[in-house]
Regions:
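Intrinsically disordered, low-complexity regulatory regions of eukaryotic proteins
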Residues: 1-136
Length: 136
């Protein structure tokens, strides 16, 4: 068997995993529930639209799975608010991480910034990019 064929066979084997398939199925159903609930329940829309942030992996998943046919009434509002929330949070963590970097610049020697968001900006950025919060 050629190396290319062996690689293809290994890729097919590693494509499926019972646990990964179950997790993926559950997550895709949850995403569908978000769309359906946003479309049908005003309280959920208000709660969703007032969130301070969504992690990048879930933003990506919600945008990639979005289908206008499933969200006829509120689809535009949904994507607009999802983008607004994520963009606002991205701007905030960009500002925080910039301030954090300035703290370690030699020109800022002796200056202190007691802002908790600035001091936690690295952890907050990792959580945003990966969807995982660093261990306490």
């Amino acid at each position: 068997m050629s190396p290319a064929k062996k690689g293809e066979k290994a890729a097919k084997i590693s494509e499926t995993c019972f646990i990964c398939d179950k997790i993926e199925y559950g997550l895709s159903r949850m995403i569908e529930t978000v769309y359906r609930t946003y479309e049908t329940q005003k309280d959920f829309r208000e709660m969703f639209n007032s969130q301070p942030q969504f992690c990048l992996p879930h933003f990506e998943r919600l945008m990639a799975s979005y289908d206008k046919k499933k969200m006829r009434s509120y689809g535009g509002e949904f994507t607009e608010n999802l983008c607004r929330i994520t963009s606002d949070y991205l701007k905030r963590i960009y500002g925080d991480i910039s301030e954090y970097c300035k703290l370690y610049d030699y020109r800022a020697a002796g200056e202190k910034n007691g802002d908790e968001n600035v001091m936690n900006s690295v952890e907050n950025t990792v959580a945003f990019l990966t969807g995982r919060k660093p261990e306490e």
